[in-house]
Amino acid sequence: MTSPDRAFDGWLPGVVRRPSPHFNERPEGALVSLAVLHFISLPAGRFGGEDVDALFMGTLDAMNRPEYESLRGLRVSSHFFVRRTGEVRQYVSVLDRAWHAGVSSFEGHTGCNDFSVGIELEGTGETPYEDAQYLACLLYTSPS
C-alpha cells in the first residue's frame, strides 16, 4: 500500500462519525494492508440497539446488566461498525490503531491492529448478513 495522504484525516465521508476514546497511534511507518471483519451483536443475537455503540465509546453499563459482566472494564473499538440497515459508523480514524484484533497474527506478522482496519458487522455469525451490509462493505473497502 502507498503512504496515506496527510491531507486526509482518516475519517470517511458519508458515515456516522462517533469518535471512540479507545485507540492510539499506529507504529511509525505502519501501513494498512489488512481488513479484519468481525461480527458483533449486543445483547447477543439482538440487532438495532445502541449497546455496540456504547461498548466502542466506553459507555456500556456493564455493572447493571448481568449479560455484560464479561465486558466490564473492556476497552475495545473498531474503525467501522456496519449495521444491518447498511448504516456505517466510524469510531477511529483509519490513520490510527483501533483495538479490535487483540493478540493476533496474519501471514507471520503479529499485532494485526498495527496494520489493519477493523470492520464489525452487526450479526451473530449464524444469521445471514443483509445485502445492505455487503454493499456498505464493498463501498468502503474497494479501492477508489
Task: Kindly label every feature range from the protein language model.
Residues Y140-S144:
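Conserved small/polar residues in nucleotide/adenosyl-binding loops
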Residues T2-R26, L34, S41-L139:
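Active-site-adjacent loop/helix surface patches within enzyme catalytic domains
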